[in-house]
Amino acid sequence: MDGLKMRTGKYFEVSAKVTKTQEDGDEKRVKETVVVEAESFGDAEEKALAEYDGYDVDIVSVSIAPYKDVLFSKDGHDYKFYKAKVEFISPDEKTGKEQRTKVVYLVQASSLSRALAYIDKVMKEAMIDYVSVAATGTSVEAVFIKGEVIWL
């Protein structure tokens, strides 16, 4: 996967209200959503707070992310994250009928079409029958993975 890296883990989406200094020098309270790789809700909150060290921050919510796989791009133009829903297609061994398994990915890309192209690239290399069901933009600002930070 040239320029792409898949990372599997247990992810949490953490929403926080953060006081940040704007370009004009004014301070403003903004809501941000970050993704944290963690073992529990408490661990996710602790890691998010550590990343916001030095800021006035309140954690608003912590929820289990609907994905276990994050697809990162090394392209500097890929500055957003998208959720992509995919259905894997396989025959049911007992009935022989088509069986579909839904999976959600978080994909770093510059556009919706590029996110879907990245999914296609990964799935073709995996040689799995699939269909892309949906893709939507997210408000994710950053992904914190065991010592690494992917900022947008």
Task: Describe each model-derived feature in a short phrase.
Residues 1-3, 61-74, 137-147:
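Short amphipathic beta-strand and strand-loop transition segments with alternating hydrophobic
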Residues 53-63, 125-134:
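Short loop-to-beta-strand transition segments
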Residues 61-125:
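Short, solvent-exposed interaction modules
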